[in-house]
């Protein structure tokens, strides 16, 4: 098979499996936000992803379905399958045998993390497609040294940045390769200038963001009124404080997690071929090694220093994983060629089929989202709990963007006014009020919340913070909290929670989905506690922690509830679990200090407070 036919075959096979396991609706985290931005040509979270917004909208127009989320999920699967096809084509172009190239591409297609992102609305498939194209074009430009190849490479590099900022992590390897292989490249001023202009030309698609910002009914993350705001959006300024913020111990912990992740992405029997392939690439295809090895090094340098919820960290290693998949193909090919010295390897096709089958079987169940309606049902349950003409203020990623999607795109409960507490999508502030200093914005939002409370409309919150009015309190009402004047009868108006969605089993539920299910149990505990059933409430809180056992926020919130109910040892266990999940957050240590102080263990309390202080 030629490189093109191998790539096409890989794409078709990957896409077929993705369609079988495709999520039928909105999913967790940023899925709802991205769908709302694509369908309404809005401006999603930094860095904006204009290429996905435009191409995803085009695909949704072409598709004949009347299920908006499903169409954008298909777009995600299409680009992911194309990335796998590009990987097979690249390997074939580098001399890897067709069956081995096809196998390596499918092994990556069915790797744990990439598959999970291919079947929901996400940008990573398209981003990695551009990564493969840039690697292929850099190799061609360095070998043929045609000016038009260099210009096309520059354009692809710029375009890749509009898909995901990870693209910049392969740039150092590209520059090193061009300077190394293209003699006098740096001295060709005209070519260098034209190449830079080509990069700018590819990147010019970001003009979509200020042109569309605030227009139409799509999701808009934030106003982009000027050049500074645009730069902050494009560069991901919101996330900068999370980079290079970890101590050495944190970097080592992330390195350990990356290594464990790599062990689980492909079958354990294939792991030696990953690193053997790197060695073979170094010996036989130095150009390919420079690009892939440089990308892996840059990816690890950035991601190992990145502090975020550990459950969300694996996607930040996808660049390193696709480069390791390239090494896997090179190593697998070398193994087959060595065995071929003893005669024609008749076992090649069965061996390739077995390798793909092992990885496919290992990851199918946990990657299958075809029956996963939990996120959508949670959003619908939240909206169903609201009385007519209510106001709901949301925050966080668990449900905020699911609710935004349901109301913005599917028009569920249009009588409800939905606001995001920090201004993502639907904001209490007017568009021009985002020019105010952050502290003034916070005060203004609080004032608006108070005005809503006094207006007489039922005001509900997803997460209770500090009440905007004195003499008012948050009262659990079903899955939400209602803000109302302090009541003398706490049992009045209790709402029965429908728990069916919390008990869905028989399908794989990742950490984010289980966090949603745990919210049912946590709110059941809140309602029972309000009704005076402390024993039942404690049992419900414990069940919430059992369901979302790897969620730092759930374990911490349960610990806090146990502490307030004087269940100190149980509170300590959950606080310790929260600290183990993310050792670089101060709140669990501060809570543990309060627990120890209440137990009279003041020495331990002082040490824990010191630890909390160091992390703030």
Language model: regions and residue ranges:
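Signature aromatic-anchored transmembrane alpha helix within multi-pass, membrane-resident enzymes
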Residues: 282-285, 330-361
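Aromatic- and kink-enriched transmembrane "portal" helix at the membrane-lumen/periplasm boundary
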Residues: 20, 41, 62-69, 73, ...
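Transmembrane-helix signature of polytopic, membrane-embedded enzymes
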Residues: 4-7, 12, 87-110, 129, ...
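Transmembrane-helix motifs of polytopic, lipid-linked glycan transferases
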Residues: 8, 74-95, 133-137, 326-330
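Membrane-interface transmembrane helices that cradle and orient dolichyl/undecaprenyl
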Residues: 92-95, 118, 134-152, 157-159, ...
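C-terminal luminal/periplasmic domains and tails of membrane-associated envelope-modifying transferases
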Residues: 380-391, 398-404, 410-616
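Hydrophobic, aromatic-rich transmembrane alpha-helices
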Residues: 264-286
């Amino acid at each position: 098979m030629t490189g093109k036919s191998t790539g096409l075959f890989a794409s078709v096979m990957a896409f077929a499996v993705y369609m079988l396991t495709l999520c039928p609706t909105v999913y967790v985290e940023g899925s709802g936000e991205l769908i709302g931005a694509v369908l309404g040509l809005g401006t999603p979270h930094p860095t904006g992803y204009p290429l996905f917004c435009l191409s995803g909208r085009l695909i949704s127009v072409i598709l004949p379905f009347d299920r908006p989320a499903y169409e954008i999920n298909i777009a995600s699967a299409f680009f992911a399958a194309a990335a796998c096809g590009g990987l097979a084509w690249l390997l074939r172009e580098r001399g890897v045998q067709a069956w081995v190239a096809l196998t390596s591409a499918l092994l990556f297609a069915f790797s744990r993390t990439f598959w999970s992102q291919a079947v929901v609305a996400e940008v990573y498939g398209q981003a990695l497609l551009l990564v493969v194209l840039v690697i292929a074009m850099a190799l061609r430009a360095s070998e043929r040294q045609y000016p038009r190849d260099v210009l096309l490479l520059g354009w692809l590099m710029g375009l890749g940045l509009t898909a995901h900022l990870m693209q910049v992590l392969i740039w150092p390897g590209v520059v090193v390769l061009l300077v190394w292989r293209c003699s006098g490249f740096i001295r060709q001023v005209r070519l260098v200038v034209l190449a830079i202009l080509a990069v700018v030309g590819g990147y010019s698609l970001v003009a979509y963001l200020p042109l569309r910002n605030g227009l139409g009914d799509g999701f808009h993350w934030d106003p982009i009124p000027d050049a500074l705001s645009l730069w902050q959006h494009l560069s991901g300024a919101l996330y900068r404080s999370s980079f290079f913020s970890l101590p050495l111990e944190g970097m080592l912990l992330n390195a350990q997690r990356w290594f464990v992740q790599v062990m689980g992405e492909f079958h354990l029997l294939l792991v030696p071929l990953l690193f053997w392939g790197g060695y073979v690439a170094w010996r036989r295809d130095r150009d390919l090694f420079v690009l892939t090895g440089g990308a892996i090094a840059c990816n690890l340098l950035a991601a190992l220093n990145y502090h975020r919820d550990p459950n969300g960290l694996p996607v930040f290693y996808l660049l390193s994983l696709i480069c390791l998949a390239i090494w896997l193909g090179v190593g697998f090919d070398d193994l087959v060629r060595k065995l071929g010295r003893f005669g024609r390897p008749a076992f090649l096709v069965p061996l390739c089929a077995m390798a793909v089958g092992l990885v496919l079987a290992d990851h199918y169940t946990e990657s299958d989202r075809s029956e996963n309606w939990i996120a959508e049902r949670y959003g619908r349950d939240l909206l169903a709990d609201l009385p007519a003409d209510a106001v709901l203020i949301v925050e966080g990623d668990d449900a905020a963007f699911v609710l935004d999607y349901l109301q913005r795109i599917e028009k569920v409960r249009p009588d409800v006014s939905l606001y995001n507490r920090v201004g993502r999508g639907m904001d209490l502030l007017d568009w021009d009020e985002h020019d105010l200093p952050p502290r003034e914005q916070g005060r203004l939002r609080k004032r608006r919340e108070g005005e809503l409370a006094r207006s007489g409309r039922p005001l509900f919150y997803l997460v209770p913070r500090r009440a905007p009015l004195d003499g008012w309190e948050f009262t659990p009402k079903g899955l939400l909290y209602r803000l109302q004047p302090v009541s003398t009868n706490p049992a009045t108006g209790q709402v029965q929670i429908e728990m069916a969605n919390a008990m869905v089993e028989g399908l794989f539920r990742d950490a984010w989905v289980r966090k949603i299910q745990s919210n049912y149990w946590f709110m059941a505990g809140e309602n029972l506690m309000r009704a005076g059933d402390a024993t039942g409430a404690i049992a419900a809180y414990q069940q919430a922690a059992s369901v979302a056992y790897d969620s730092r926020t759930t374990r911490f919130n349960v610990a806090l509830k146990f502490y307030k109910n004087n269940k100190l040892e149980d509170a300590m266990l959950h606080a310790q679990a929260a600290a183990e999940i993310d050792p670089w957050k101060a709140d669990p240590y501060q809570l543990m200090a309060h627990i120890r102080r209440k137990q009279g263990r003041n020495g331990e309390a002082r040490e824990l407070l010191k630890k909390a202080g160091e992390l703030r």
